Amino acid sequence: METKLSLKKRLQQFSKKQLIALIILGAADVFVIAAPYYIKNVVPNLHLYLGITEDEVATLTSIIGYVTLATQLPGGFLANRFSSRKLLFLSEISTGVITFWLATNILTRESQKSNALFVQYCVIWGLWGITSTLIFWTPLWKLASQQATQENQALGFGIQGAANGVWGFIFIFLIALIITAVAYPAGGESSANNPAPFAIYAFIIGGMLLVTGFTVLFFVPEKPIEKYDSHTSLKTAKKNFEQILITLKNWKLWLLSFFLMGMYVFQSTFAYYLLQMMQNAFLAPVILGTVLGGVRTYVLRSAVSVYLGRLADKFRSYILFLMLCTGLGIIFVLMFILLGFGQVGQQQNYALIIVSAILYILTGVLSWGMVTVRYNQVAEIEIGKNNYASSVGLLSFIGFSTDGWLYTVTSVVGKAYTPDGQKNTSIQGYQIIAAICLGIALFGLLCGTIVFLVNTWELKRLGKTDYRWRTLDNA
């Protein structure tokens, strides 16, 4: 009861305008990220609805990943120089228009040649990389951080995450569940004869992106940024360049970036491939795969983000909290991989399906714990107060780089282990992919542990107990 009262009091510290802004930012987040990244984690065997193969979905993801690598750091610069609200508005509108293009291709895919269709998908995913990174990612989190005080940063991100989960549950998960249960009860194979329901699904997402863009523009407050003119632009450019150099020289920030990379595989590759493994190797029912994917992606985020953010605030160190989440996640994924050795042929093993489903959900809970406070770890290293955006840019650049190079690797592995005449990889292929990702998670955990141990030693030497070095300035 005491914890609930404490949480209630913390929530009362947010104004109505701030809460509305965080809810809107949750919607902005979910709709921009949905089509390029999350739908494949909600709808098993997305490739069948698109009319391509499983390894080609990995190729599309790698394309957007490489574009992200090229635009992440410039995105931090833009967020420092231009209005984050206007950048986010532009991101929502442009992503919506591109999503309409995707919906049109889904609707007409049977009348197009497979190569021409895949080339268009490649262009779509590449453009999404620009609209969901260069003008979206850093502006989103800068605006979110401005809606909370220093003490309530994690809770503010938790509220945004909870809103994200609610929006995603209603507009992404429930619609996907209805489509798979009613229009495609036999799975994606049947979509070839009736692509309209899934195309309508994409049109709905595109429409919501347009609506959300205007709500961001009119209802999300933004702190003023430094004004630039012809006399100060050169000086400011030099200052920004110096800030980037300072950021790049911070070895702790590099290690935390690798730590974020290790955490991100839980949100991205594990979320996708473990679901695919349940569906295609353990032969889980289609409806179960959709329910698990939706629950993990959206329901859990709404249910646990605020509480995990509040729990993280109680820890003396955000990095320690993230280390615990990552360590437990590694154990659960290792257990999932070992389950694969219990699958025999094409027979449904309900024990494997049940245990794998539980492990999948548990890793989802831990993953959202990582997502909620992964940027708060910046507060535990010494950086300049004006380097926040560029620091987030470096964290995201390294952390999300796996969407490029790792999906290139998984595409090769998946294709090599795809049996002749099939569109999905084998159980051995899924196990190899999961093992590769597990190694990345272990490396990230090691990097985070090093920073935590060094910070602990430095605090003891200085006679301090507070791991938060930085006084947050979001202006």
From Swiss-Prot:
Family, per entry: To E.coli YihN.
Pfam families: MFS_1
InterPro entries according to UniProt: MFS, MFS_trans_sf, Sugar_transport-like
Organism: Mycoplasma pneumoniae (strain ATCC 29342 / M129 / Subtype 1) (Mycoplasmoides pneumoniae)
CDD domains: MFS (cd06174)
A single GO molecular function term of this UniProt record: transmembrane transporter activity
Record's protein name: Uncharacterized protein MG294 homolog
Superkingdom to which the source organism belongs: Bacteria
